[in-house]
Amino acid sequence: WVRARGHDSYWRFHRDQFLTLVPPPGKLTLDVGCGEGRLPRDLKRLGHRVIGVDSSSTLIEAARRADPGGDYHCASATKLPLESASCDLVIAFMTLQDVDELAAAISEMGRVLVASGTACIAIVHPLNSAGKFENESADSSFVIAASYLDEFGYTDDIERNGLRMVFHSKHRPLEAYSRALEASGFIIDAIREHRIPEEGFRSGRSRRWQRIPLFLHVRAVSRRSLDTTRIVSRS
């Protein structure tokens, strides 16, 4: 699925939208939940020194095959194999909606970041995961039948062009992510809710997603960097 270039939203629009939030290359970039490594490879082409981490040994092996010179490790998002304050950028692209321990994963992201570090996050938009369209028409109503404010697991089984992918994820309200970031010393710097661009449409039914965001992008900075700035300015 992810290795079929042009097959999913990553290739058609999602990567380019997300990269507008990512700062320029610095000391070290960590991709948490790197999968088979397509984002680390793109980041390397942009000049980033990247380490990729994923809990799936199968995906890590695929990443190593696709990028023999890359730095990939099989590890949990809640126990990252890096020293504290070793990265200046941590990316979690379409990862955090799939982890069971959200607070622990974000805490680990904060631990490995330097004081001036940045976290860039992409998730399934909580509005998207809470509900669904009633039908495939472009003007279909979008209905939230359950509670947006409750956390629950869900499964998406999708087949397209002969390729099948089963996603097992968790719906969480936006506040759950905000609170986890706050508890780990982050301040949200930017939030983006992109529409699908015209060139991203695969079919007429895709136009439904011009009214409801598919994804949520968040950039957060370490509160410690702000505290340091205040200390320097007073000295």
Give short role names for the model-derived ranges.
Residues 30-32, 36-79:
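Class I SAM-dependent methyltransferase SAM/SAH-binding core
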Residues 168-191:
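Short alpha-helix
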Residues 78-89:
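A short acidic, Gly/Pro-enriched loop at the edge of an enzyme's catalytic core
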Residues 103-115:
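A short glycine-rich, Lys/Arg-flanked "PGG" loop and its adjoining helix->strand segment in the class I
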Residues 127-130, 162-175:
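Acceptor-substrate binding/catalytic loop of class I
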Residues 89-102:
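A short SAM/SAH-binding and catalytic strip from SAM-dependent methyltransferases
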Residues 1-25, 38-42, 59-62, 118-155:
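Conserved class I S-adenosyl-L-methionine
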